Amino acid sequence: MVKASPLGSIYTGTVHPGRYVIVVSGDTASVEVAVDTGSSVAGDTLVDLVFLPDVHPLVVDAIISEADLADCRGDALGVVETVTIAAVIDAADAGVKAAAVDVPAVRLADGLGGKGYALFSGDLAEVEAAVDAAVSRGERTDTELRHVIIAQLHDEIRDNLARELRLNYRLARRPGER
């Protein structure tokens, strides 16, 4: 992939369950050539891919940053879960482009059995629109997807989500630690 086209960045690594993931960024033409080359080489071992020429910056931030529900606007929370990393990135991008929502987290594969999930927060109508767009994108690409909308997120749950999303990390800390 990197020999076929100049890329802005490339991240690779293994994730559960025994998959190898490649994430690339750069100008649209270069990424398209790299993705075509990579998918051609991968052949039938390729599990999934997504090519987003104009991925929303909130999706990128949600992938690379710690989750932060503490400052999210609105009372509603939407959760979209997919069976692949590519599908959740695609769903998150569709959702945030369709509605005025925050994207506090997009989590990929590790500790999730290879699945991914995205969180949308905001006013109920906006979260519903974001989740609907994410679900529609999944249906168009024949992606297995689950979703739920919590209309009024309780403050205790918001506080828990603002600290750490992985339960094993939360349980390993002593009471009173964030």
Model-derived features with residue positions:
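Long, contiguous binding/interaction regions
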Residues: 2-18, 32-115, 121-178
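Glycine-rich loop at the start of a catalytic domain that most often binds anionic cofactors/ligands
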Residues: 23-29
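Short low-complexity, flexible loop/linker segments enriched in glycine and/or proline
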Residues: 26, 119-120
